[in-house]
Each structure stands twice: as structure tokens, then as C-alpha cells.
Amino acid sequence: MSNIIDEIDKASMRDDIPEFRPGDSVKVHVKVVEGSRTRVQVFSGIVISRTGGGVQESFTVRKLSFGTGVERTFPLHSPIIDKIEVDRHGAVRRAKLYYLRGRRGKAAKIKERGSAR
């Protein structure tokens, strides 16, 4: 039974996802359905967490929109995600960056990770 579930999970996982971690700035291209039309909307921000594993994996992106913090959680292997672009890699020492919620301006900046990796 477990083998059947693993095969179904493997079949529904995407293989076009770039490597990114918490602290990275990403642009998530999301398919939005409005009536009969489908268009692509870009949500760009900083990845503050990745949770789960396999086909259930999801990630949360935070951005500031007109001074208000906006967070959106995306299932990683969802068909509504058109593509994910990594803008820059951030140097952080935490897996969950929830402390960014209480910071504004320069205090919310994340240093760029060098090419040593």
C-alpha cells in the first residue's frame, strides 16, 4: 500500500522548481482565474518558511505592500504556480524567519549570501 502512495506522490511532484531556502528573495508567478480568463500574477518577496515534505511541501513568502506586510503560503507542487524565480540568496541562520514580522525598514533587510556555497 505504501508503494502505491509513493508512486502517486512521485507522479504529482513537479521537477521544474529551483532550489531556494528561507531568506531568499523570490518571484512566484501565480495563475489567477477571473471569470473565463486566466492570467499570471507575480508575488515577489522573501521566503520566511518552508514546511512539510514530498508532495505536501509548502512555503511562505512575505512582502511589504504600501507599508503593510502581506504573507502568502503556497503549496510547492501546486498547479496554480506557473514558475518560481529566485532573485537573490539571503544569508540567514534560521529555518523560520517569523522575527521579520515585527521589523520595518532597514531592520528587516537580509544580507546577501556569497557564492561560497
UniProtKB/Swiss-Prot annotation:
Q: Which GO terms describe its molecular function?
A: structural constituent of ribosome
Q: What's an example GO cellular component term for this entry?
A: cytosolic large ribosomal subunit
Q: Tell me which UniProt keywords the record has, alphabetically.
A: Ribonucleoprotein, Ribosomal protein
Pfam families per record:
Ribosomal_L19
Q: What SUPFAM superfamilies does this protein map onto?
A: Translation proteins SH3-like domain
GO terms in the biological process aspect are:
translation
Q: Which family does it belong to?
A: Belongs to the bacterial ribosomal protein bL19 family.
Q: What does this protein do?
A: This protein is located at the 30S-50S ribosomal subunit interface and may play a role in the structure and function of the aminoacyl-tRNA binding site.
Q: What is this protein called?
A: Large ribosomal subunit protein bL19
| Gene this chain is encoded by | rplS
